[in-house]
From Swiss-Prot, chain A:
Zn(2+) binds at residues 23, 25, 211, 292. This is Adenine deaminase. It catalyses: adenine + H2O + H(+) = hypoxanthine + NH4(+). The active site is at residue 214. Keywords: Cytoplasm, Hydrolase, Metal-binding, Nucleotide metabolism, Nucleus, Zinc. Substrate binds at residue 293.
Length: 355, 600
């Protein structure tokens, strides 16, 4: 399927290109190696049918049948995370890995309800992630934002309780953003208006985003913008089906956080080449390229960039545009954005020979 | 035994014209048409080409429904009862016979909307309505559209031609003449009612529509209590269908504890899920059909959706669904609250759309109240987050929650209270009109017409306001109450279910303008005069355009309003809206407005 070869020069360029990640579930970075370590450390008993070795689990991860199949493993994976250190370690191993891939800024998701339902407090989970974020800033100069996601398949009342329990974390700005994930179609955005309004009432600076338009039709995207008042859409691939929406996304600079490898793994499209990336570029709809649940979907952020290159080719100028719109669409302060933008120019200038 | 058919003369003797005229109000339009085709006597008496009395009766039956709070009750004391649209048409079209006024109302009227355009609530989007021009839109450097600032016609069915370009139906050989009485009633709009986030629109055929992606805007209404959920027939059908295939399971739910084998019984089997699934893909065909039917849009307009009762989907197997059930319920009235609405059907059954999860109307049951055949519902009214209806011989009935529906039938009990001493059927204490506010607060006036009553926190009390003349009609929103006397009208603010006495204001436009109807949105008001003119005032938030007075700059430069905060405009005095026609009905939603406008 690959049409364009990722030469060493291309790979080096895309590695060095400053990247921002806006769509990454920390729970989705749990590699089989760490999973089995935690099983041992925490004395967790896995179901009898669960694979016994790292390699067997890798084989399963490479062969998900669909979203449901993936989620079954995903939620078992979550069960091995118990202490603050576990959460720290999970996020820290992600940052270590991507620090060599040119990642400069990360806005990462986590699902408190996957943990609070197991009796682990929101504070423990958040503290672990927060520590890893601070360390990433310190050691790798990766700036970060923490986004708490609500699980849309859970009852709305439970999501409200989650928001309420996060009040002090939202007020103090430890949680920078609110998101919404899990099965989209049966649980439309209008169910969560009150959750979003409540969260925003805690802190006017709270940023809002939500998964929409992955499985659901474009009206899910429109309603997410109108009703939840988000400034960003996670996934949003299916927006392309609605010309009016495309105009709106471009005009209001609503960034879509696309996840190419995830879309293929979960059979949203058969191949990365089928994604409407060129159409988004042509219509000036800003998007960023992200890894979603990289441990499960066979590739971290750089791999996603490389896969997209192999299907679309694209010149240095287009990649610079993607890097810039990812920075512009980030929630970091103007000074940080300026730093990153000048880094983009430096890298682009450095690869003089690349078309 | 052989019966002899009575002659025309015999019928005339037993049913003289004055008797027939007296019973006309009790017949449906269709009954009257059938009667007119019975024999020569009735055919001559009920002369569709000449009888103004007949057409007046048909007009009132079709367009003057008194089931909602737009009109007061018809009572012995209201001698010359006229609905708002009758009053307006008689004033604006003096000397025109009722057959022509009927046709005017039916064929030359259209729904216009303006204000906040979010999620299609106006019944159109920026690109779906060719009648929307750039000068009708409040935009920020052409990127963000805040709203529509002038009344714009909603695209409705076969009428691709805007109303101003349409032929008059009574003075030419228009084909519409053919379908005049028994034909297509879907084009003719009887009522429009504004909710917090949408409009509900009722056609002469009894079909109910709602604009936009959601009527509730994500807020819960006076439906099931927190934490309770209705039984969802279509979802249940999907679930049982999926259960019949052992390897397939429905929407997942995380449960159990760490390592609990229940959570994932056999991962190797679930890996084969897709295979099993695809072999039986056609099991979804009937369901998809049912799902399509259950969310039907207006032909040619995706922003207007048909609203159906839940009870028609009472089938366990989608194959058993009888498509003709769709038209089995005919609605005659609709009233809207902030994030809910009520509709009454021609059998006097009441349906409620009252929450985020309620896509189809739940039929309400009032346990222990007498049967509708003896004690019908005479008027329905939605408040902000509650409802009030008037039942003959029972009185005012209020509620703000209900049981959940449990089975396929789609019924639920309302958690209602009857306001004491409101059930008189005649005399000075008979209720003349009422208006529903929020949290089960209800304002009402009686035949005696001198006291305003407030039922709130389960206590009735009377409110003394310095109002001149007899009170004949009340209307309310979340924060405003309007009181009509025989001569004028007043508004007063409501705070925490109490009247703020010092805010009593007489609505005065000019001495010769008489207001006959008022409606309030979150921050704006609309008034309708007896000559079909429309006036608006209040706050236009965030450039939403709900006043319909044009662009913010022109409102301010004309002196009608002033800027308030960043992007809001305050218009203090009721200001006339340019509509180029005769307005016969108005409604204010949350941040949007609607009207039915006739263009000659």
């Amino acid at each position: 399927m690959a049409k364009f070869e990722c030469t060493d020069e291309v790979t080096n360029f895309l590695t060095e290109l400053p990247k921002c990640e806006h769509h990454l579930h920390l729970e989705g970075t749990l590699e089989p190696e760490l999973l089995f370590q935690l099983v041992e450390r925490n004395g967790v008993q896995l179901p009898g049918t669960f694979p016994k070795t790292v390699n067997e689990l890798h084989v399963i991860y490479n062969n998900f049948a669909d979203l449901q199949d993936f989620l079954n493993y995903y939620y078992i994976g979550c069960n091995v995370l118990l202490s603050e250190d576990d959460f720290f370690e999970l996020a820290w191993s992600y940052f270590k890995r991507v620090s060599t891939q040119g990642l400069r800024h990360a806005e990462v998701f986590y699902d408190p309800q996957s943990h609070t339902s197991r009796g682990i407090s929101l504070e423990v989970v958040t503290k672990g992630f927060e520590r890893a974020c601070a360390k990433a800033q310190e050691e790798f100069n990766i700036s970060t934002k923490l986004i708490m996601c609500l699980l849309r398949h859970c009852p709305v009342e439970e999501c409200m309780d989650t928001v309420k329990s996060a009040k002090s974390l939202i007020e103090s700005g430890v949680i920078d953003g609110l998101g919404l994930d899990s099965s989209e179609r049966p649980f439309p955005p209008e169910l969560f208006v009150e959750c979003y309004q409540l969260a925003k009432s805690y802190n006017k600076e709270l940023q809002l985003t939500a998964h929409a338009g992955e499985e659901g039709d474009p009206s899910f995207v429109t309603n997410t913008l109108d009703l939840l008042e988000t400034t960003r859409i996670d996934h949003g691939v299916r927006s392309i089906e609605d010309a009016e929406l495309i105009k709106r996304l471009a005009a209001q600079k609503v960034m879509l956080t696309l996840c190419p490898l995830s879309n293929v793994k979960l059979q949203v499209v058969k191949d990365v080449s089928e994604l409407p990336l060129q159409e988004f570029l042509d219509n000036d709809v800003p998007f960023s390229i992200n890894s979603d649940d990289p441990a499960y979907f066979g590739g971290y952020i750089l791999q996603n960039y490389l896969e997209v290159y192999s299907r679309f080719g694209w010149s240095k100028a287009v990649w610079a545009k993607i890097a810039r719109q990812s920075i512009e669409g980030s929630w970091c302060d103007p000074k940080r954005k300026q730093e990153l933008l000048s880094e983009v120019s430096e890298v682009v200038n450095k690869y003089v020979n690349l078309p | 035994m052989k019966s002899e058919a009575p002659t025309s003369n015999e019928i005339k003797e037993s049913l003289p014209p004055d008797i027939v005229q007296t019973i006309l109000p009790y017949l449906t339009s269709k009954d009257i048409k059938n009667l007119s085709l019975t024999n020569k006597y009735f055919n001559k008496l009920l002369d569709y080409s000449n009888s103004s009395i007949l057409w007046h009766e048909l007009f009132r039956k079709s367009f003057g429904n008194t089931y909602t709070n737009d009109e007061p009750f018809i009572s012995k004391n209201s001698k010359r009862f006229q609905t708002c649209s009758e009053t307006i048409l008689l004033n604006t079209h003096p000397g025109i016979e009722w057959d022509k006024l009927y046709n005017l109302r039916k064929y030359r009227s259209a729904v216009f909307t303006w204000g906040c355009i979010k999620h299609g609530r106006l019944g159109y989007t920026i690109s779906s309505n060719s009648r929307l021009s750039a000068d009708s839109m409040n935009q920020l450097d052409r990127r963000i559209t805040f709203g529509v600032c002038k009344p714009v016609e909603v695209p409705w069915m076969l009428y691709s031609v805007p109303i101003s370009g349409r032929a008059n139906s009574w003075d030419d050989d228009d084909t519409e003449e053919e379908t005049n009485i028994l034909g297509e009633y879907d084009r003719s709009i009887v009522q429009i009612s504004g909710g917090g986030f949408s409009f509900q629109i009722l056609t002469q055929s009894g079909k109910l529509y709602s604009t936009g992606a959601t009527y509730h805007g994500g807020h819960n209404g006076p439906g099931p209590l927190a934490g309770e959920h209705d039984f969802q027939p279509i979802d249940e059908t999907i679930r049982s269908l999926e259960r019949s295939f052992p390897l397939v399971h429905g929407p997942f739910r995380v449960m159990g504890s760490i390592g609990d084998p229940i959570r994932i019984q056999n991962p190797h089997h679930t890996t084969n899920l897709t295979g099993t699934f695809q072999q039986h893909e056609d099991i979804y065909a009937d369901l998809m059909k049912l799902s399509d039917i259950s969310s039907k849009c207006l032909p040619g307009n995706d922003q207007v959706r048909r609203m159906l009762p839940k009870s028609i989907f009472n089938v366990k197997d989608p194959k058993d669904f009888d498509e003709s059930m769709i038209d089995s319920v005919r609605f005659v009235a609709v009233s809207s609250g902030r994030s809910h609405f009520l509709a009454l059907d021609d059998k006097n059954d009441l349906y409620s759309w009252d929450g985020r999860e309620v896509n189809h109307g739940v039929k309400l049951i009032f346990n222990d109240l007498p049967m509708r055949s003896t004690n019908p519902i005479l008027k329905i009214s939605c408040g902000w987050n509650c409802n009030c209806i008037f039942i003959y011989g029972v009185g005012l009935v209020v509620w703000k929650s209900r049981d959940t529906t449990v089975g396929f039938d789609g019924f639920a009990n309302a958690h209602y209270k009857v306001i004491p001493n409101t059930g008189e059927v005649n005399g000075a204490n008979k209720i003349v009109d009422f208006a529903c506010g929020s949290d089960n607060a209800v304002f009402y006036i009686t035949n005696e017409g001198e006291k305003l009553w407030l039922y709130s926190n389960e206590i009735e009390k009377y409110i003394d306001l310095p109002i001149e003349g007899k009170m004949v009609k009340v209307q309310a929103s979340n924060n405003t109450l309007a009181i009509f006397t025989s001569d004028t009208c007043y508004t007063v603010e409501i705070k925490d279910s109490e009247v703020a006495h010092n805010t009593l204001t007489k609505i005065e436009i000019t001495p010769n303008v008489k207001i006959i109807s008022l409606s309030f949105g979150d921050y704006h008001g609309i008034a309708l005069s007896d000559t079909g003119d429309m006036y608006t005032w209040g706050l236009e938030s965030e450039m939403c355009g709900c006043l319909g007075l044009g662009k913010p700059e022109s409102i301010v430069s004309s002196g009608a309003g002033t800027f308030e905060r960043a992007r809001s405009i305050r218009v203090q005095r009721p200001t006339k809206v340019d509509i180029d026609g005769t307005c016969v009905a108005i409604t204010a939603g949350g941040w949007q407005s609607g009207a039915i406008i006739i263009k000659d």
